[in-house]
Amino acid sequence: MKFKSLLVVALAAAVPALACAKKPKTPAAPAAAEAAPVVEEEEPTITEECVVNVSLFHESVKNKMYADAYEPWWDVYQHCPNANKSIYSDGAKIVEALYGATTDAAEKARLANLAIEMQDKRIKYFGNDPKYPKSYILGEKGLAYIDFFGDTKLKEARECLRQSAEGMGPASKIMVLVKLVDVSYALYKENPNTLAEQFIADYEIASSLLNEQATNSNNKNAEIAGKQKDYVDNIESVLSKPIEDV
């Protein structure tokens, strides 16, 4: 169906966003498109119900009643994920317990994905926390990849652990540093010709930070850090052997 030229021009002027099947031979220069205004996402409202549910699931977790904790925790996690950091510290315990308790493959997969998603959401709402910032949370995410996905997500785990070590420095969680070396070594064994330098770099940062922790007289975990440094040093020593002998 054809439109008269005057009608086409009128429609084009009134609704410039419409796409035309046949353009006029001498179209008017289009107006410069204005950038869409940036709309900041509103923080979820922390309702009285959320506050009550935080108290309920936290008390259940303290008593290791993880099944009872799940329902109030899930409600808070969905509706007011910015209410309290315990949503994530307690949530990790809840998800881990339920994951271990179920034999249903679909439920295990759901909980595994939830464990990772939870850390991303924690970064979104609490990534600027002075004690447990984004770098710390990335370490927790890397450990979650290992715990819930085993050797199927080693690259993702390593990336998170490496970023955590770089960001936290001497304040890094000991297990993050140890697992960084473990995971990097596992990846190296799969591709010894291409990932040797990556493994050495990961080992060096982990060993150096563990050494700082082990030699810090004010660190209550200095002895543990020293033992773990010996462990990662032993892993690094295998590079002097042929990969088939390891």
Label for each model-derived stretch:
Residues 24-246:
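Preference for long, solvent-exposed alpha-helical segments and helix-linker "stalks"
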Residues 1-32, 92:
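Bacterial Sec-dependent N-terminal signal peptides
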